[in-house]
Regions:
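Bacterial N-terminal signal peptides
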Residues: 10-20
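Bacterial Sec-dependent signal peptides at the C-terminal "C-region" and cleavage site
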Residues: 20-29
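All-alpha RGS (Regulator of G-protein Signaling) helical domain and cognate RGS-like helical scaffolds
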Residues: 28-170
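Bacterial N-terminal signal peptides that target proteins for export
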Residues: 1-10
């Protein structure tokens, strides 16, 4: 019985740790994870995944800041996410597409500690960069290509910031 209890505790601890690293809920069709592996997307679909991912990052970092305080780089990156949302919104307007509602709050989970928060940031930026790499392989209008390149570059900067902070824990 004691051995079974120990195994159950180990399993619960492992599942908790895994959930902390993957704190962006794994929605089937939302943000970068929703776009993963899809090809032949329209500009509207790509912009939708893009803004969902920006909404998702903002919601996650708001949650982290609310729990752990206004620490960098979360505060800086959350401000950047606001700008990114504005940029994507401008193209929705320009192309006459309906702007998706921000439902990102349904897709985030609070990481258990700051280290897990930085791990979450690292994974989110990796997913975001991969999404834009995929989009940039498409034939895109110049303004959309420019936007995706700027957002990908910003994600590369955010990834560096999260990795630098995560390295303090290792």
């Amino acid at each position: 019985m004691k051995r079974l209890s120990t195994k159950i505790l180990v399993l619960v601890a492992a599942l908790t740790a895994a959930a902390a690293v993957i704190s962006f809920a794994e929605s089937a069709d939302f943000g970068a994870r929703g776009a993963e592996g899809k090809s032949g997307l329209t500009v509207e679909q790509m912009l939708t995944y893009s803004i969902q991912d920006e909404y998702l990052a903002r919601a996650e970092y708001e949650l982290i800041i609310g729990e752990y305080g206004g620490i960098r780089p979360f505060t800086n990156i959350m401000a950047a996410e606001e700008r990114h949302i504005e940029w994507v919104t401008e193209l929705f307007d320009e192309y006459g597409y309906a702007l998706p509602a921000d439902t990102a709050g349904r897709h985030v989970v609070l990481p258990e500690d700051l280290k897990s928060s930085f791990e979450t940031g690292v994974q989110a930026e990796i997913d975001n960069i991969a999404m834009y790499e995929s989009f940039l392989k498409q034939d895109l209008p110049a303004d959309v290509r420019d936007l995706f390149e700027r957002l990908q570059g910003a994600s590369e900067n955010h990834l560096r910031a999260f990795r630098n902070n995560l390295n303090r824990y290792n």
